[in-house]
Amino acid sequence: RLIEQTDGDIYFEEKRLKDYDLRELRLKTGYVLQQIALFPNLTVAENIALIPEMKNFDEKEIKEKTEDLLRKVGLDPKHYMNRLPKELSGGEKQRVGILRAIIANPKILLMDEPFSALDPISKVQLQDLIKTLHNEYKMTTVFVTHDMDEAMKLADRICVLKEGKVVQIATPEVLKENPADDFVREFFARGNK
């Protein structure tokens, strides 16, 4: 919770968000941001291990899971575990950021424009990776994007907002075929040119 909501309630695991201890809530949530926030003085392995260490995971389990996840995203553990963030490309940094967000099996993954600064090839690769990881780990993912092609590719359901208000929540197919109003229709028409 960065900002308290002004109206209504948001529930997570049948409990109102405002009733959670903030630390408990944060440890159940993974974050991937547009600005890749790796700690520059920590190795790839140390960056990935931060949350599991806070949750008192076994050291051996952390190492094994880190190596396994690195392999899953195409980063050979032998070559990447001990590298510093400055030695990685933008796409590699974002992969590490994603792994750090999911290694402790969060219930919710929040992704805020995570691919907007990447080249087109890295962007497509990471979109595919997110779909694969989402299906494998079965976590709820809240993905913020202004890229309608990206939303259509990645989302099970899309929430369209206008001036902070919900205009429509629907599957990508329903949004395309039956937009709630002209704003939604134009929004998706512009995104699909």
Q: Where is each model-derived feature located?
A:
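Conserved ABC transporter NBD signature motif
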Residues: 8-16, 25
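Short helical segment in ABC ATPase nucleotide-binding domains corresponding to the A-loop/adjacent helical element
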Residues: 45-53, 63, 67
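Conserved ABC ATPase signature
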Residues: 83-88, 92
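Conserved catalytic motifs of ABC-family nucleotide-binding domains
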Residues: 105
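Catalytic Walker B motif of ABC-type/P-loop ATPase nucleotide-binding domains
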Residues: 109-112
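ABC ATPase "signature
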Residues: 169-170, 178
